[in-house]
Amino acid sequence: MKKITPLFLVLVLSLALFLPMGCKETGGGNEYGATLLNYRLKESFLKENPVYGVAYTNERYDPAEDNGEFPYLYDETSPANRTFVITEKEQAENIFEDNFIDYDKIDFQKEFFIIYLYASYNEYKKIITDAAKDENGVLKITFESVCSSGSETPIPIQNSVVIKINKTDFEAVEITAKHVNK
């Protein structure tokens, strides 16, 4: 009996340590296999696609001289968010940092990417809570962006969500972000 107890303890500890590593957080109601990915976007892509409310670095600001410029400029003219549907490898190569994606493991015949750009304070966790198509063919994806209260950055930044999803026909894509403070 004493040999079983240490073995059982090792098994339980192993499961507790390694089981969460293989899980992808997608939440419920996800019939299209929508998965959040941690792919890095090219700086040039982000600069070409600004979003409203973000504090961007002011290129004309020089701390050595008092030229009346501020270190940051808040975008007040761009859209509040931007959504991109990536269905081909060539598109992806122009958007993703090359060292963060293995194109040999992506089958663009069976899956595609959706990129959503928006302004936010730093989040530590994003979870897809729903991915479904409505009666009009609109692919609706909802995700939670969780931020620990008190850990926000002092200025809004341009944030992104990269979603890999099974190929499906749709008329439009609608993404909803629910911000949750914990």
Residue map of PLM features:
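Enrichment for repetitive, rod-forming helical segments
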Residues: L9-V10, I163
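Positively charged n-region of N-terminal signal peptides that target proteins for export
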Residues: M1-P6
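Exposed, flexible binding/inhibitory loops of compact, secreted disulfide-stabilized domains
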Residues: C23-K182
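Bacterial N-terminal signal peptides
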Residues: V10-P20
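Generic alpha-helix initiation/capping and coil-helix boundary signal
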Residues: L7-L9, V85
